[in-house]
Amino acid sequence: MSYSALEAAIEAAWEARETITPATKGETREAIEATLEALDKGSLRVAEKRGADWHVNQWAKKAVLLGFRLKDMEVQTGGPQAGTWWDKVDSKFAQWGEAQWKAAGFRAVPNCIVRRSAYIARGVVLMPSFVNLGAYVDESTMVDTWATVGSCAQIGKNVHLSGGVGIGGVLEPMQAGPTIIEDNCFIGARSEVVEGCIVREGSVLGMGVFIGKSTKIVDRETGEVMYGEVPAGSVVVAGSMPSKGGVNLYCAVIVKRVDAQTRSKTSINELLRD
């Protein structure tokens, strides 16, 4: 089935979603399963870059949500001390053997979790971390210990998600775009990027930077305040701005801009020094 045919079938299924159950068969089930398989293999993405802009395939997000209706809850094996879990989404690695691992070409350290329909590209390293369904993690990216990649999040090439980083998931509301980290970004430990925000290519976020749609992102040099997007090549640290009543409120501060040449010659710690 072509992607245009899949899209039409998913849109029709979405309109009749209340009728979809684990007993559903035929074109509806086939379209949902084919879409989830395409996401899992990386041939389809929830969002794709076209020029400088990101286009969201809302129908692919709908397929992810519809997938929950096709399965009942069931025992998931593999827990500590022969324990189990109770869920309706399979592991990406279910029934994988040596051949599948070699073909996939990424490294998955014990106790990392990746749910089916998430794509992991070649050269990725997954420390004990969590990658949710519909996400896309591109080549040679490091997902460090306790980092979380939320549902449908898009992570670029050569990205470093440091320990404890949270990249937010966006399945609902349906019109919302996914959280996006573009190529060659460094996200410092325990930072959070959520609510469909975009960190543009080559940016560096220091430790403990939190960015949501309502977070002020302040360019220290120009005084410009922006929301929802970190410009390419930005070096960002946590800061604060004066507010009413003499109280300072949190913001993210762009302390400098760097190009790829500077990044290649300068350590992350040097970039973050004020």
From Swiss-Prot:
Main localization category: cytoplasm
Documented EC number(s): 2.3.1.117
Keywords: Acyltransferase, Amino-acid biosynthesis, Cytoplasm, Diaminopimelate biosynthesis, Lysine biosynthesis, Repeat, Transferase
Keyword Protein transport appears in the UniProt entry: no
Annotated pathway: Amino-acid biosynthesis; L-lysine biosynthesis via DAP pathway; LL-2,6-diaminopimelate from (S)-tetrahydrodipicolinate (succinylase route): step 1/3
Residue sites binding substrate per the record: 107, 144
Pfam families: Hexapep_2, THDPS_N_2
One GO MF term: 2,3,4,5-tetrahydropyridine-2,6-dicarboxylate N-succinyltransferase activity
GO biological process annotation, one example: lysine biosynthetic process via diaminopimelate
Coiled coil, from the record: none
Enzyme class: transferase
Catalytic activity: (S)-2,3,4,5-tetrahydrodipicolinate + succinyl-CoA + H2O = (S)-2-succinylamino-6-oxoheptanedioate + CoA
Assigned GO CC terms: cytoplasm
Subcellular location: Cytoplasm
Quaternary structure and partners: Homotrimer.
Family: Belongs to the transferase hexapeptide repeat family.
UniProt-recorded name of the protein: 2,3,4,5-tetrahydropyridine-2,6-dicarboxylate N-succinyltransferase
Phylogenetic lineage: Bacteria, Pseudomonadati, Pseudomonadota, Alphaproteobacteria, Rhodobacterales
Gene from which the chain derives: dapD
